[in-house]
Design a protein with these regions (language model features):
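Short cytoplasmic-facing helical segments at TM-TM junctions of multi-pass membrane proteins
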Residues: 181, 185-226, 247, 251
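Transmembrane alpha-helices
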Residues: 168, 172, 204-237, 270, ...
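Glycine-rich helix-loop "coupling/hinge" segments at transmembrane-helix boundaries
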Residues: 156-157, 186, 233-270, 289-293
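Intrinsic disorder/low-complexity segments
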Residues: 1-47
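C-terminal transmembrane helix and the adjacent membrane-cytosol boundary/short C-terminal tail
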Residues: 130, 187, 218, 222, ...
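Periplasmic/extracellular loop-to-transmembrane helix junction in inner-membrane transport proteins
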Residues: 45-46, 70-116
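Generic hydrophobic transmembrane alpha-helix motif, especially the helices
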Residues: 141-177, 184-185
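Transmembrane-helix boundary motif in ABC transporter permease subunits
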Residues: 110-140
């Protein structure tokens, strides 16, 4: 699709510091999965544990249904979950959900992938080379507090209404936390480890690869998790404003058309995808960092 007009549609349906021992990096933001501890507790599983873990979500869904059914709020403002589910099925059967979902996932994956690759390299280079740090660090610190959604008009002005503006926006927004986490992780490597490697004949490149990067990995993975959340936020925000496809476009168009049950269906789809991506990432990280336990 082209991005010429934000109010046309082809839809079939109308009407989100714990110090690890022996290192200077932080893994607090990744939660307890990053830390060692009681191995028996870490391995506990089963239905009771799952119910306890996700009970707040079940209670939220129950409260939603009760409030909607009792008429405490307008059904248009908060449709019953069965109507939301029916609208989701209609969107899925028509193919609109999958087509727009693929467009969103492609943009998000492209921007996040570039951010991880380039941000990691820049962060480690800042920690490893003082001249690079002197040049790059002020730029990163200056732009980090800026709300990245404020860059949407700038990206449209520079890159137009196509996918490029959205991908670059996600790239910029996600690269900053990745860069800072890679920098902090690499800079926190104990100097005695680097000196020991060098005294044993390791070159600077080998010391970087075999000492600094493994030491920086937990902090870097923490930053990537933050970037993953940023990617969802920036993706939907940009598609709400300047897109003719994607989840954000669907939410905006369905909301403007008063199809609130379908709008909530798309919102919940994005929420579930974000939650699943975060849980899947934590499982991957737990495997990657198994050597630390």
């Amino acid at each position: 699709m082209t991005d010429a007009s934000p109010h046309q549609s082809n839809f079939a349906v109308i009407p989100a510091k714990t110090e690890t021992q022996g290192s200077g990096f932080s893994a607090a933001s990744m939660g307890p999965r990053f830390r060692g501890g009681d191995g028996n507790k870490a391995k506990r599983s089963g239905l009771p544990t799952l119910l306890q873990r996700y009970a707040p979500l079940l209670l939220l869904a129950l409260a939603w249904e009760v409030v909607s059914r009792l008429g405490l709020v307008s059904p248009a403002a908060l449709p019953p979950l069965d109507k939301v589910g029916a609208a989701w099925l209609n969107l899925a059967e028509s193919g609109d959900l999958w087509t727009n979902g693929l467009a969103s996932i492609s943009r998000g994956a492209a921007g996040l992938g570039l951010a991880i690759a380039i941000g990691s390299a820049i962060g480690v280079a800042m920690a490893w080379h003082m001249p690079i740090r002197v040049v790059i660090n002020p730029i990163v610190q200056f732009f980090y507090p800026l709300p990245k959604s404020a860059l949407i008009p700038v990206m449209v002005l520079w890159l137009g209404f196509g996918d490029a503006s959205k991908i670059v926006l996600i790239f910029v927004g996600c690269m900053l936390p990745v860069t800072l986490s890679a920098f902090n992780g690499a800079r926190g490597t104990e100097q005695v480890l680097i000196w020991s490697a060098r005294s044993l004949g390791a070159s600077r490149a080998r010391a970087l690869w075999e000492v600094v990067l493994p030491s920086a990995l937990p902090e870097l993975l923490s930053g990537i998790r933050t970037a993953l959340a940023f990617a969802f936020v920036l993706l939907v925000a940009s598609e709400l404003i300047v897109a003719r496809s994607g989840f954000g476009y669907m939410i905006g168009w369905l909301g403007d058309g008063g199809v609130y049950d379908a709008m909530f269906a798309v919102v919940l789809t994005v929420a579930v995808l974000g939650f699943a991506a975060d849980r899947g990432y934590l499982m991957l990280v737990r495997r990657v960092l198994a050597w630390r336990e």
